């Protein structure tokens, strides 16, 4: 299993880092078999697998539950787990206790926090406490309630400078990597070159040190609309939906199960059932 020191070396050597967001045992197993470098258990599970309208309702217990499943499916892959909405905006002690709970109970190797500002100090204190932290800048989904959209961030010179300053701040605080989401590729390149820690892009162009996409987006599973930055490598919904429809049709028509899908018993045993001939 790769560790933070390995990710630093990959950046140094120009080897791209691959991260895939997964939420359960079978998807994590697939990701590990594909030899991805990292798995992110994102609070996006709230929308992707729990059916919420946003990530806001996701709880620490949700994150622990799904991370434990991912851990069972990917026993030899570095796992990063999101700290959900408002679990790191209270006191430093509350933040440390929430991170401790996630790491100890789920087996995650690191936690991810969105934003900068007061979050920078939380990253520093978690790092001091021995908890590896991945930062997340640009489009931060937990803040969509304030920003009102999932549009690209940091397009103006002022916003770009602010993001650069924040990236340097979270690096100085001890973050082991930074996710850069939905920012101009030119800015992502400058940030990546300015930092000594890896940048993982999603909608941030080719020049970041690595890339992350959601498992479901990659394979086309349960997706009604794809973001511009998502490339579909498969569309398994096109296989799943007719398969399920065929099952329903065959059960209604009494053509499933066939004999080959059933078990039998010896006729003499059947005749002797409850002493009846």
Swiss-Prot record:
Signal peptide: none
Gene3D superfamilies: Phosphoenolpyruvate-binding domains
Coiled coil: none
Gene Ontology CC: one annotated term: cytoplasm
Active site (record annotation): 181 (proton acceptor)
Pathway(s) per entry: Cofactor biosynthesis; (R)-pantothenate biosynthesis; (R)-pantoate from 3-methyl-2-oxobutanoate: step 1/2
Keywords: Cytoplasm, Magnesium, Metal-binding, Pantothenate biosynthesis, Transferase
Enzyme class: transferase
A molecular-function term among this protein's GO annotations: 3-methyl-2-oxobutanoate hydroxymethyltransferase activity
Residues bound to 3-methyl-2-oxobutanoate: 43-44, 82, 112
Protein's UniProt keywords contain Phosphoprotein: no
GO biological process: pantothenate biosynthetic process
Origin: domain of life: Bacteria
Free-text cofactor note: Binds 1 Mg(2+) ion per subunit.
CDD domains: KPHMT-like (cd06557)
Compartment(s) of residence: Cytoplasm
Residues holding Mg(2+): 43, 82, 114
Known role: Catalyzes the reversible reaction in which hydroxymethyl group from 5,10-methylenetetrahydrofolate is transferred onto alpha-ketoisovalerate to form ketopantoate.
Name of this protein: 3-methyl-2-oxobutanoate hydroxymethyltransferase
Gene (name only): panB
């Amino acid at each position: 299993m790769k560790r933070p020191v390995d990710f630093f070396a990959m950046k140094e050597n120009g080897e791209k880092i691959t991260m895939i967001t997964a939420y359960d045992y079978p998807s994590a197993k697939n990701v590990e078999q594909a030899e991805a470098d990292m798995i992110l258990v994102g609070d996006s599970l709230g929308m992707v697998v729990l059916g919420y309208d946003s990530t806001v309702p996701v709880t620490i217990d949700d994150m622990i539950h799904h991370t434990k499943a991912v851990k069972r499916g990917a026993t030899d892959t570095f796992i990063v787990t999101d700290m959900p909405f408002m679990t790191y905006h209270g006191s430093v002690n509350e933040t440390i206790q929430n991170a401790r709970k996630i790491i100890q109970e789920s087996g995650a190797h690191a936690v991810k926090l969105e934003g900068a500002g007061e979050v920078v100090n939380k990253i520093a204190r978690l790092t001091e406490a021995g908890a590896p932290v991945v930062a997340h800048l640009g489009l931060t989904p937990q803040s969509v309630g304030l920003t009102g959209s999932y549009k690209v961030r940091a397009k103006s010179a002022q916003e770009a400078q602010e993001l650069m300053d924040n990236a340097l701040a979270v690096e100085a605080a001890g973050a082991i990597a930074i996710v850069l989401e939905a920012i101009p590729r030119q800015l992502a390149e400058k940030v990546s070159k300015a930092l000594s820690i890896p940048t993982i892009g999603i909608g941030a162009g080719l020049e970041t040190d690595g890339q992350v996409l959601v498992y479901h987006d990659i394979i086309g599973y349960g997706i009604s609309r794809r973001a511009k930055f998502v490339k579909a490598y498969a569309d398994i919904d096109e296989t799943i939906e007719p398969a399920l429809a065929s099952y329903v049709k065959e059960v209604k028509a009494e053509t499933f199960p066939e004999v080959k899908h059933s078990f039998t018993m010896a006729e003499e045993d059947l005749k002797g059932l409850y002493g009846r001939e």
